[in-house]
Amino acid sequence: MSYQPQTEAATSRFLNVDEGGRTLRIHINDCGDGKETVVMLHGSGPGATGWANFSRNIDPLVEAGYRVLLLDCPGWGKSDAIVNSGSRSDLNARILKSVVDQLGIDKVHLLGNLMGGHSAVAFTLSWPERVAKLVLMGGGTGGMSLFTPMPTEGIKLLNALYREPTIENLKKMMSIFVFDTRDLTEALFEARLNNMLSRRDHLDNFVKSLEANPKQFPDFGPRLGEISAPTLIVWGRNDRFVPMDAGLRLLAGIAGSELHIYRDCGHWAQWEHADSFNQLVLNFLARA
C-alpha cells in the first residue's frame, strides 16, 4: 500500500497538563506509529507552530518508520498561553515531560529549532535517561556571541513583530529569516499573519513574559558537558538570528557531537534545505 501523507487535521489532539497548579491545554500533532519517537520542538517566532515549522520534515520521518510528535509550546499554536517569569526553555521541557508521560513514551529523539533547540537541551539536562538522540538547529545555549552584537538583527525584528504584528513587520523579519527569499510566497505570509492575529493572547503572553524576565532563555553553556546523548548540530552559514559561533559552542561543549553547516542558508535549515536535511537526520537517527 502506498504511503499516505500526514495531515494537520487528522493528527491533531489535545492533552491537559498541570503546570504549577494550573491546568494547561496543550496541542500536539501525533503522526505515525513507529517504535521510536521523534519529538519536534518549534522556535519562538510569532505565529509559529509545530506543524508550520516542520511541515517539510514530517512525512520523510513517518515514512521511514518513526512516530513523530509535534508540540505547540505554551503560548504558541493551539496551546494555552502562559506568562512566564522563569526559564521558558525549562517550562517547555516540563510540558514535554508531562506529554510523553501521558502518552506512555519512555525515550525520545529530540529535534528543536531556536527555542526548540534550547528547550531540547533543557529537557536533556533534566531527564537525560529519557533522551536517545539530539538534533539542534539554530539554538541550544542562549549564550552571547563572540563576534555578533546581541541581540541580533533577527531577534530585534522578531521582538518588534510581537509588539506590532503587521504584514510589513512580518515581511521585514522573514526577509532575513531565510537566505533565498523566493520561496516566501504571499500565501505563506498570509498564513503566518493569520496564525498571529488569531491568537493575540499569545502575542501579549510573549511580550509580558519578556517584561517579567528579559532572559527567558538562560545560558546552558556551562552545563553542556553533562550531555551524553549523541548530538547532531545543524546551522545555516547565513543565520542572522543566532550567530554560527553558537553552534561552535555546542560542538565544543557536547562530547562526541557533530556540526553540519549549510552554505546559503539562514535560520530555517530544515525548511530551506529540506531534502538534504531530512536525509541527514535519517542517517543520524539510524546509526547504532
Curated annotation (Swiss-Prot):
EC class, as a word, reads: hydrolase
Record's keyword terms, sorted: Aromatic hydrocarbons catabolism, Hydrolase
For this chain, one GO molecular function annotation is: 2-hydroxy-6-oxonona-2,4-dienedioate hydrolase activity
Q: What is catalysed by this protein?
A: (2Z,4E)-2-hydroxy-6-oxonona-2,4-dienedioate + H2O = (2Z)-2-hydroxypenta-2,4-dienoate + succinate + H(+); (2Z,4E,7E)-2-hydroxy-6-oxonona-2,4,7-trienedioate + H2O = (2Z)-2-hydroxypenta-2,4-dienoate + fumarate + H(+)
* GO BP term (any one): 3-phenylpropionate catabolic process
User: Which family is it part of?
Assistant: Belongs to the AB hydrolase superfamily. MhpC family.
| Function as written in the Swiss-Prot or TrEMBL entry | Catalyzes the cleavage of the C5-C6 bond of 2-hydroxy-6-oxononadienedioate and 2-hydroxy-6-oxononatrienedioate, a dienol ring fission product of the bacterial meta-cleavage pathway for degradation of phenylpropionic acid.
- HAMAP family given for it? MhpC
- Protein name in UniProt: 2-hydroxy-6-oxononadienedioate/2-hydroxy-6-oxononatrienedioate hydrolase
Question: Could you tell me the gene encoding this protein?
Answer: mhpC
